[in-house]
Amino acid sequence: MKKRWSIVTLMLIFTLVLSACGFGGTGSNGEGKKDSKGKTTLNINIKTEPFSLHPGLANDSVSGGVIRQTFEGLTRINADGEPEEGMASKIETSKDGKTYTFTIRDGVKWSNGDPVTAQDFEYAWKWALDPNNESQYAYQLYYIKGAEAANTGKGSLDDVAVKAVNDKTLKVELNNPTPYFTELTAFYTYMPINEKIAEKNKKWNTNAGDDYVSNGPFKMTAWKHSGSITLEKNDQYWDKDKVKLKKIDMVMINNNNTELKKFQAGELDWAGMPLGQLPTESLPTLKKDGSLHVEPIAGVYWYKFNTEAKPLDNVNIRKALTYSLDRQSIVKNVTQGEQMPAMAAVPPTMKGFEDNKEGYFKDNDVKTAKEYLEKGLKEMGLSKASDLPKIKLSYNTDDAHAKIAQAVQEMWKKNLGVDVELDNSEWNVYIDKLHSQDYQIGRMGWLGDFNDPINFLELFRDKNGGNNDTGWENPEFKKLLNQSQTETDKTKRAELLKKAEGIFIDEMPVAPIYFYTDTWVQDENLKGVIMPGTGEVYFRNAYFK
């Protein structure tokens, strides 16, 4: 989360502006905060309309933030960030590590009372792999034998090696041993879909109602598009006795100053990441009064280059733009959330990639940037920067992204003499632009969908793969990623991934800017929230003391 980004991965992570008169500088409880002891409704902000609340279509942090409360996979992530049994009560692995057999829990049900079966998982995974459904995260299923061939039209869905042996047993065959497969099965692309409902109503996921059924700790009971979402406790959930909240009210406020004010007024119980955002100018005061929470997470903020659009099809132009950025200035003066300048793709929080704190190139290396610019101009038959084709820098509407883009625009003009035009659009419009490569340079964030460095590289394996968006691919890069998936020695595997990252940085289809931190404030009585460190949040064990 696209995480991702994720992550989606992604991703809506930061904002910046707060007027001097708008921040009252209160403590964590906020002025006008009502007594929250023992209450059972959680009020949070998710900023914008989700891209999709279909587990097979979701590819951003907003959608994932809702789905993680309403659905559950064969496994789920616990408070230690580790996978544990979810819908599956038993997980067996073959000696060669390539075959998994999941036993579905007794009595697990959908929110409408239908039994959750192994067939619901087989149906969901094959639905995501069906190329007609255009799932951006289908590649997360490529670990399964036959999955990539089916998704790319070179094979049949019937040959995908996921099989419901019976209602209680799901058998999965992988291409190679994948030690983190039980982390993958907690990710939303691997979550089940009620086959009976989905076949009856192809648009089941577009509104709240009788057909929006889920199997997680909460169920969606209301969805006012672009306004709010209401979740209520799912009494059919197998672990319902540990779910203390009766309701989660999610509002969509795409103004960070307003979000903080509503928190201070007691209208929100949480303000900031990972689902909302704090005004950056409020962070020093919130930190000083002790109410600010800051945690490094496995995530990176970068600018994607459309490598098939001029002048970004020239690697030296891409390098010139990347090397000329002053990341330290951005994190110190703009984002102000203790982020780390990124001169690499994989966050240094990933084991084996600790050296990425330093990265592959110097920050703010204007001298080298000018050399790359001169070389790129010569290759294009141009004499000066002003001769370059028009460049547009795009981002989704948000104060934070706007401020970062303005800073970058100024750096490129000052350091290289390159003029860029800024372009913003609402999230759903923007993400469509990226996926269709209708852009030149576009901001994006990527959060680890699971705790492995391949997260930040594999989305660029194939130029037409979901969430790549850059039009870039490299045969040697792809070869190294494939080798890493068969290498069982952890040290050797990390070396393969480092080599792949080296190729990626050398060809520069993205300009990394900073590694993320989560910054937020919360009601002092709110406890039990699970934040594993990869940018997601779970409220199934949350409560007000």
From Swiss-Prot:
<keyword id="KW-0653">Protein transport</keyword>
<dbReference type="InterPro" id="IPR030678">
    <property type="entry name" value="Peptide/Ni-bd"/>
</dbReference>
<feature type="modified residue" description="Phosphothreonine">
    <location>
        <position position="470"/>
    </location>
</feature>
<keyword id="KW-0732">Signal</keyword>
<dbReference type="GO" id="GO:0043190">
    <property type="term" value="C:ATP-binding cassette (ABC) transporter complex"/>
</dbReference>
<dbReference type="GO" id="GO:0030420">
    <property type="term" value="P:establishment of competence for transformation"/>
</dbReference>
<keyword id="KW-0472">Membrane</keyword>
<keyword id="KW-0813">Transport</keyword>
<feature type="lipid moiety-binding region" description="S-diacylglycerol cysteine">
    <location>
        <position position="21"/>
    </location>
</feature>
<keyword id="KW-0597">Phosphoprotein</keyword>
<dbReference type="GO" id="GO:0015031">
    <property type="term" value="P:protein transport"/>
</dbReference>
<keyword id="KW-0178">Competence</keyword>
<keyword id="KW-0749">Sporulation</keyword>
<dbReference type="InterPro" id="IPR039424">
    <property type="entry name" value="SBP_5"/>
</dbReference>
<dbReference type="InterPro" id="IPR000914">
    <property type="entry name" value="SBP_5_dom"/>
</dbReference>
<keyword id="KW-0449">Lipoprotein</keyword>
<dbReference type="GO" id="GO:0042597">
    <property type="term" value="C:periplasmic space"/>
</dbReference>
<dbReference type="GO" id="GO:0045121">
    <property type="term" value="C:membrane raft"/>
</dbReference>
<keyword id="KW-0571">Peptide transport</keyword>
<feature type="lipid moiety-binding region" description="N-palmitoyl cysteine">
    <location>
        <position position="21"/>
    </location>
</feature>
<dbReference type="GO" id="GO:1904680">
    <property type="term" value="F:peptide transmembrane transporter activity"/>
</dbReference>
<comment type="similarity">
    <text>Belongs to the bacterial solute-binding protein 5 family.</text>
</comment>
<protein>
    <recommendedName>
        <fullName>Oligopeptide-binding protein OppA</fullName>
    </recommendedName>
</protein>
<dbReference type="GO" id="GO:0030435">
    <property type="term" value="P:sporulation resulting in formation of a cellular spore"/>
</dbReference>
<comment type="function">
    <text>Part of the ABC transporter complex OppABCDF involved in the uptake of oligopeptides. Plays an important nutritional role. Binds peptides containing up to five amino acids residues regardless of their sequence, with highest affinity for tetra- and pentapeptides. Binds to the sporulation-promoting peptide PhrE (Ser-Arg-Asn-Val-Thr). Required for sporulation and genetic competence.</text>
</comment>
<keyword id="KW-0564">Palmitate</keyword>
<dbReference type="InterPro" id="IPR023765">
    <property type="entry name" value="SBP_5_CS"/>
</dbReference>
<feature type="signal peptide">
    <location>
        <begin position="1"/>
        <end position="20"/>
    </location>
</feature>
<comment type="subunit">
    <text>The complex is composed of two ATP-binding proteins (OppD and OppF), two transmembrane proteins (OppB and OppC) and a solute-binding protein (OppA). OppA interacts with FloT in detergent-resistant membranes (DRM). Colocalizes rarely with FloT membrane assemblies.</text>
</comment>
<dbReference type="Pfam" id="PF00496">
    <property type="entry name" value="SBP_bac_5"/>
</dbReference>
<dbReference type="GO" id="GO:0015833">
    <property type="term" value="P:peptide transport"/>
</dbReference>
<keyword id="KW-1003">Cell membrane</keyword>
